[in-house]
Every structure is written in C-alpha cells, then in structure tokens.
Amino acid sequence: MTREPRPEDRFSFGLWTVGWPGADPFGTASRPMLDPWQYAEKLAELGAWGITFHDNDVFPFDADETTKRQRVDRLKQAADSAGLVIEMVTTNTFTHPVFKDGGLTSNDRGVRRFGLRKILDAVDLAAEVGASTFVMWGGRELSLIHI
C-alpha cells in the first residue's frame, strides 16, 4: 500500500538532506550539487509541504550581497510557484574552518563577532522569506568539551 503525502501531513525537508553531495571524511563529493530551487521544485513534485534550509544551502559562504540576493529571490520564487512553505531557516556556523572552535564559543573575538553577525543575518533572512521558525544549532559550540 503506497501512501501519497498530502498537504495536511506537513512534510517538510531540509535542503541539506537532499542537497548533500555525498562527501564524507574518507572522500570528496560523489555527486553534483544542484541549485536549491531545483531541489525545491522536485520536492514539491513529490508532495512536500515545505522546505527548510541553512543560509549556506542557498548561497556560498563567501557570496557577495548581490549573489545572496539573487539566490534567495530565486529560491523564494520557486517555493512560491510550487506552493511550498519555507518553514524554518537556520545558519551554518560549523562547516567552514573559521568556525573550528565554534561560532559563538571561539576564543577569537573576531570569530565570535562574525558568527553573531552571520546568525543575525540569518534571522533577518528567515523573517524575509516568511519562515515561522529560526534555529541556531550550535554544531561546534564547545565541541571539544563534549568529547
């Protein structure tokens, strides 16, 4: 028996769950990355209700403001056209090497300031795209203490 998702099921998917390029500690990426709007369109075809994403799922870590704006606008347009809700936005303060000691817990004041600015920018992004939830996941915060 196959069950098709319905909008009232409110299935949402993180773009990182489908956009992951297959890299791991033992090897480099094994499949190409698609643009986030391509994932959004496909998820809508499969019956998704909404999407969630990290800031850097939409634009590269080192993107300039023009590139960020273009990519956010394109994703928002794709989500709206497909009838998808952008349910949650979060920020990535753990992947880039600058955050090796955490975005908010680094001993380096400059890294903490940068991490906080990145988080606040992502809060604004969440509000802009209509997300009802913002998550600050501290993936590397105090990570050595937890080993």
What are these regions (language model features)?
Residues 1-133:
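N-terminal pre-domain/capping segments
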Residues 145-147:
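Conserved small/polar residues in nucleotide/adenosyl-binding loops
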Residues 138-140:
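Short, structured patches in soluble enzyme cores that scaffold and shape functional sites
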